[in-house]
């Protein structure tokens, strides 16, 4: 009997100890923060491009003026935050459609508007096309990703550009057919341009804006300031 009592007491004590251990507060698990992975390394922009100007001689640009740009960005997350710094490199092309004859001579570069350009059957489109080598820089802010990995994003930055080529393209009637004329050079188109950028989006789709703090032409050309508004597709 004594042995049975001792055995029952031992079992009771063992169960009590097990119950006490089960009810102890679990040890606090240290939360580890996962480092943000580089993202948005490729960017493709489609933009409406136009010019702020004070020309009062009838010069006008068209709503069909547009641009395209492609960039590779080096995304560097800042420690474990949702902020990153991204320098990059790429190319951009801008086409400014207008209603004028672009002339460059010893006195400078200027636009001579063509009377009744829209109704004139002797002329079709005219544009100034400029190609740039771009160096963009963005400071990026990301929200917490959802279940699919998508997130809201905001990027403020600056883009510096080096002019590669500037070409005037015309389509004029010659006798009974239209002839395309290309004129290269235009040294009065500024060699450098730069300005702030803004990008706001969700997932891989973004709204993009750029405003140049430099003018399209140097001092020998008309005072015109470029700007761009469009969409930006990002990935990887």
Label each region the model flagged.
Residues 28-40, 77-84, 144-152, 167:
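Short loop/turn motifs that connect adjacent beta-strands in outer-membrane beta-barrel proteins
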Residues 49-51, 92-96, 142, 161-165, ...:
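Structural signature of outer-membrane beta-barrel domains
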Residues 50-71, 188, 217:
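Surface-exposed strand-loop-strand hairpins of Gram-negative outer-membrane beta-barrel proteins
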Residues 57-63, 97-108, 112-130, 163-174, ...:
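Extracellular/periplasm-exposed beta-strand and loop segments of Gram-negative cell-envelope proteins
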Residues 70-76, 89-91, 135-141, 156-160, ...:
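Residues on the lipid-exposed face of transmembrane beta-strands in outer-membrane beta-barrel proteins
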